[in-house]
């Protein structure tokens, strides 16, 4: 049987995801078989599990931290917002149905049974299960329907840790208020407090530690210092609020990313950030970079409509005339074609709309969702290399262009043997693919960046370090947590 540990928070973005990742890596480093778990997550950022099911990217990342094969049991319920208070409900990796909030809440017992199935599976197959809560664990207007926080600790028998972000201010009030608002049976599950993102001399907190322990009879088990050198994947699009420029700020190569209104899988661009200056563009911004990325989105037709309304479509054509390089990923790839056909309005209120017309391609929506871990080979010019990625798309595309990838596994454009499209227009290179994670393949990433390096007479890059950077930072996080927290009474 597994030992269950749960991390809950006083608010959203308090540090739950990072703390779970660090504990998973710490336990894995000690030789234990570890699984992350989040009963219910709401996110447009998802990846594909070992079973070809869809799970939140946070639980996928935590699985990598735990050195575990990502499973649908790590995130049995995934809610993907579609707008108008409706979400696509993913159960054990498979699309279940679309529900509005009231429908979903009234059927929470059905979802709870699915969650219990996963808890039983993890209990049988792992030494430790590290659970992440959602948002604040004491939203008193939601407690009776909350199936993502301390009800899960109660079901699994987990010891719970409450984490709060001191960087926001009011940390002791947040901790005390959270404890007081919890029902007594859930309050008893809390075994310790963690204060996250502290800067400065910890001695200034000691009086606060003593007082909060006196008031709650729960100990502060540690303070995690703020470490701006840690490079960790973001969980969802909230992290993009106010984010404009990031990456290698000294790089002579600039990558622009169109900030779609319903952007999904935005971490696809992260592998470029060590070598390039990265800049998000709003629809009315000018394209200033060498490379333009049209990323994934929940609603391709909506984004295409917005690009037209704000003149981004014309700016993309001017970028092509200047010899720009374009990469469209999933929904962004679909906008590169001639037509996006959505007769049943499955993508939103726009319906059928013409695309950018850079590819001789039509995409039809309303199909069964393709959810695949995919592999194949890119053979363009003198390049010939293997690639891997994952697919999450309901649009099927028929393209008359040169395929970008010959598939050995996957669905690709429309269930044939090919994925993506590739085209050269003058000095411009246009790439499109359904492969999320395409830039994690160092040969393709380097090829893309080196087109610009050649034009600017810069040295070629030969980096293959994305996985290495991830693991280095996870080990650093693990060490930071082990040195900062006293988990001896929780991890037995």
UniProtKB/Swiss-Prot annotation:
Q: Which residues form the active site?
A: 330 (nucleophile), 436
Keyword Iron-sulfur on this protein?
Answer: no
Has the keyword RNA-binding been applied to this entry? Answer: no
Record pathway: Cofactor biosynthesis; adenosylcobalamin biosynthesis
Q: Which UniProt keywords apply?
A: Cobalamin biosynthesis, Glutamine amidotransferase
Q: What is this protein called?
A: Probable cobyric acid synthase
UniProt organism field: Methanococcus maripaludis (strain C7 / ATCC BAA-1331)
Residue ranges crossing the lipid bilayer per the database entry = none
Coiled-coil features, chain-numbered ranges:
none
């Amino acid at each position: 049987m597994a030992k269950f540990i749960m991390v809950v928070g006083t608010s959203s973005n308090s540090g739950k995801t990072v703390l779970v990742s660090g504990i998973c890596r710490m336990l894995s480093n000690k030789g234990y078989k570890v699984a992350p778990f989040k009963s219910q997550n709401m996110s447009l950022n998802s990846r594909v599990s070992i079973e070809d099911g869809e799970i939140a990217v946070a639980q996928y990342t935590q699985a990598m931290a735990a050195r575990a094969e990502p499973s649908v049991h790590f995130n049995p319920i995934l809610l993907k917002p579609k707008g108008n208070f409706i979400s696509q409900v993913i159960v054990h990796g498979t699309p279940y149905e679309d529900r509005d909030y009231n429908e979903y809440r009234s059927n929470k017992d059905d979802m709870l049974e699915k969650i219990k199935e996963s808890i039983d599976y993890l209990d049988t197959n792992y030494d430790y299960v590290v659970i992440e809560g959602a948002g604040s664990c004491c939203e008193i207007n939601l407690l009776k329907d909350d199936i993502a926080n301390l009800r899960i600790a109660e079901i699994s028998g987990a010891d719970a840790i409450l984490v709060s972000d001191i960087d926001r201010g009011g940390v002791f009030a947040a901790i005390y208020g959270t404890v007081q608002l919890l029902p007594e049976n859930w309050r008893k599950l809390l075994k310790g407090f963690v204060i996250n993102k502290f800067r400065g001399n910890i001695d200034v907190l000691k009086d606060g530690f003593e007082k909060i322990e006196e008031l709650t009879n729960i100990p502060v088990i540690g303070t995690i210092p703020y470490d701006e050198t840690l490079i960790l994947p973001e969980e969802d699009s909230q992290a993009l609020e106010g984010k404009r420029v990031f990456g290698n700020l000294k790089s002579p190569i600039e990558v622009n990313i169109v900030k779609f209104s319903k952007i999904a899988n935005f971490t696809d661009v992260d592998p470029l950030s060590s070598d390039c200056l990265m800049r998000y563009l709003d629809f009315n911004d000018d394209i200033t970079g060498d490379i333009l990325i049209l990323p994934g989105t929940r609603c391709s037709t909506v984004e295409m409509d917005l690009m037209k309304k704000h003149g981004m479509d014309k700016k993309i054509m001017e970028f092509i005339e200047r010899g720009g390089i374009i990469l469209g990923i999933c929904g962004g790839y679909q906008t590169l074609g001639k037509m996006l056909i959505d007769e049943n309005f499955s993508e939103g209120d726009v319906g059928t709309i013409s695309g950018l017309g850079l590819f001789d391609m039509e995409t039809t929506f309303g199909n069964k969702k393709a959810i695949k871990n995919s592999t194949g080979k890119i053979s363009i010019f003198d390049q010939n290399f293997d690639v891997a990625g994952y697919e999450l798309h309901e649009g099927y595309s028929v393209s008359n262009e040169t395929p970008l990838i010959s598939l050995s596994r996957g669905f690709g454009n429309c269930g044939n043997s090919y994925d993506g499209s590739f085209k050269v227009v003058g000095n411009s290179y246009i790439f499109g693919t359904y492969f999320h994670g395409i830039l994690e393949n160092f040969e393709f990433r380097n090829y893309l960046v080196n087109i610009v390096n050649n034009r600017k007479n810069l040295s070629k890059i030969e980096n293959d370090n994305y996985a290495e950077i991830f693991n280095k930072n996870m080990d650093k996080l693990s060490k930071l947590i082990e040195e900062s927290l006293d988990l001896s009474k929780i991890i037995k």
